[in-house]
């Protein structure tokens, strides 16, 4: 994953310090592209240990069209907790619960989760019901019927609903491309947290590419990651510098259950990661 480390180095060399919405501060560049050939391995970062369980469950959650953190919390995935908690803190129902106490209530009380665990019409809603259109179903059908189409688009950015979302989509637009029996995917990401978010996104959309390729009888080929504002938060600089000093290891292999022919039939047990060697965990606070 030298490709990722090159991004980190580029930001340190060329980036500008900027204020941001979270008041954390970032070092940022605008406009950057990375390419990952999935024939060379599954691009899961090796210069720190990645939480693959969270990556898989979040992607399945998107594909279900779900927007409530209940499913994630039930599966011990905590990457979205801060946003509904922040909204809950501003409500009349808030009783000075800590984030940990809030998550426990979400996990153990489905009614509480229904009322306070929703993120609004974020990714899953837009993927499966963008103003009445199931984009995932359309994409898969179109890839099969018209693989040369230049309209194989998945869009998460719905301007009419942005003010209802806990966090407007960061990874906003996906385009698929078919050539000689191989499927590629390009993601445009308007905003990317280089330490926490981007390694997660690389693996997630590479996995989506593999899943769509399998159900359309194609071979997964290239994931292209195009970034708008790519930034390192000021409280992540030390962790990123540590990664730059580490030597990337050989990429692992991701094996999908070959019996799955429908995108909606994938379950957590249908993914097996082999030969993943990595450095230790590096932690960092998320900017909300």
Swiss-Prot record:
Pathway: Pyrimidine metabolism; dTTP biosynthesis
Enzyme class at the top of the EC tree: transferase
Database matches in NCBIfam families: PRK01827.1-2, PRK01827.1-3, thym_sym
Family affiliation: Belongs to the thymidylate synthase family. Bacterial-type ThyA subfamily.
Subunit-structure text: Homodimer.
A GO BP annotation: dTTP biosynthetic process
This protein's UniProt keywords: Cytoplasm, Methyltransferase, Nucleotide biosynthesis, Transferase
Residues that coordinate or bind (6R)-5,10-methylene-5,6,7,8-tetrahydrofolate: 51, 193, 287
Broad class of where this protein is predominantly found: cytoplasm
Catalytically driven reaction(s): dUMP + (6R)-5,10-methylene-5,6,7,8-tetrahydrofolate = 7,8-dihydrofolate + dTMP
A Pfam family assignment: Thymidylat_synt
An annotated GO cellular component: cytosol
This enzyme's EC code(s): 2.1.1.45
One GO MF term: thymidylate synthase activity
Protein name as catalogued: Thymidylate synthase
Subcellular location: Cytoplasm
Active-site annotation: 170
Signal sequence, start to end: none
InterPro entries recorded: Thymidate_synth/dCMP_Mease, Thymidate_synth/dCMP_Mease_dom, Thymidate_synth/dCMP_Mease_sf, Thymidylate_synthase, Thymidylate_synthase_AS
PANTHER family attached to this UniProt entry: THYMIDYLATE SYNTHASE, THYMIDYLATE SYNTHASE 1
Gene3D superfamilies the UniProt entry points to: Thymidylate synthase/dCMP hydroxymethylase domain
Binding site for dUMP: 21, 150-151, 190-193, 201, 231-233
Function: Catalyzes the reductive methylation of 2'-deoxyuridine-5'-monophosphate (dUMP) to 2'-deoxythymidine-5'-monophosphate (dTMP) while utilizing 5,10-methylenetetrahydrofolate (mTHF) as the methyl donor and reductant in the reaction, yielding dihydrofolate (DHF) as a by-product. This enzymatic reaction provides an intracellular de novo source of dTMP, an essential precursor for DNA biosynthesis.
